[in-house]
């Protein structure tokens, strides 16, 4: 195995609503995430006076970021993916003037990263938006939100033009099909036509952000971000193959629009077959032509699909509701572990788009135990990440242009799906439990030293292959 390229970016990925805390500090407004105390897979509910949402404090990154950045630098990070809390900059979402205290926080954060030699990769909207835009406008169902997002994007592009050169528009933009409130600010029971119209507005907003970035920051690069939910046919029946193709198109459609600049023909048919009419203006079509510079995505699992709906209805284990693959093992949360699938996905996306790729989320959520001596022996995490990185290396050998790899949750954080601390991803243990109890003390896990060695050797310390099929 060859070393990873010298230009390859190594690091980790976080999200503001899962690490920052300080949910109303320094003028921050209420975000949609603040109304999801049980996570993406829970229900939206009003704030209950005196009842704390675990994300209100999260891991207190807002106040402890210097300590955390120092730990990331100790591992050798060259890149850290973070998100800006939109409601920290525009508390209601529709203000003309931004909240200076919110802007100043990210100035301090980016300065700290620069001193540590870590490049920021910044997501504009990661599973949240100002709740004011939902309450007063109806979320992304309202075309007016496009303008408010563009104003926000232009504001942060201008403010951080000398500090940030890598941007992403919307985190896992295709998740709106599975979690409409999280993705586009719509009620979970919203109809399919309403969801796709809101998605259209978000795609236009993404393209406008790309256009603004290219205009204001000609040296910067801006990408999209997809949930990489690769689907296999359950059997070799042609009907299952066709069903898998259609399921993969459901999420790749977002990338097709963002990378190719127009709606693909298969979606036109989908809309016709489902009696969906997308209200699209001529200016929308022109805006969509502003395509992303690179494709970024998350990768956690694969699954199977069948043409037999009775089999599909019994799918379990995650928000994507894919049928378990009998040849794969699963995590404690039912997420199937498929390192080879990452190589397949990388090649699939490269063949489809011929644009640089960036793996901006990948990791293993697991329950960690603190030993009597205070150590955390997370060999299972090391095995998971080792085998996925081996496949990334194989994809590079295949000729795929890969910019970098940021593992999800380099430090334990509040999980998105169920707002749990017990579902841990990090190389760094944070002393906090699901009830919000704990000192928030940071402790290096065994995987901390392992990842540092991987980065130092540019992958030459990786070993083939430790996870085997049952």
Swiss-Prot record:
A Pfam family that the UniProt record links to this protein: Glyco_hydro_1
Keywords, ordered alphabetically: Glycosidase, Hydrolase
Domain of life per record: Bacteria
EC number: 3.2.1.86
GO function terms (MF aspect): 6-phospho-beta-glucosidase activity; beta-glucosidase activity; hydrolase activity, hydrolyzing O-glycosyl compounds
Other remarks on this protein: Part of the cryptic bglGFBH operon.
Protein name: 6-phospho-beta-glucosidase BglB
Species name: Escherichia coli (strain K12)
Gene encoding the protein: bglB
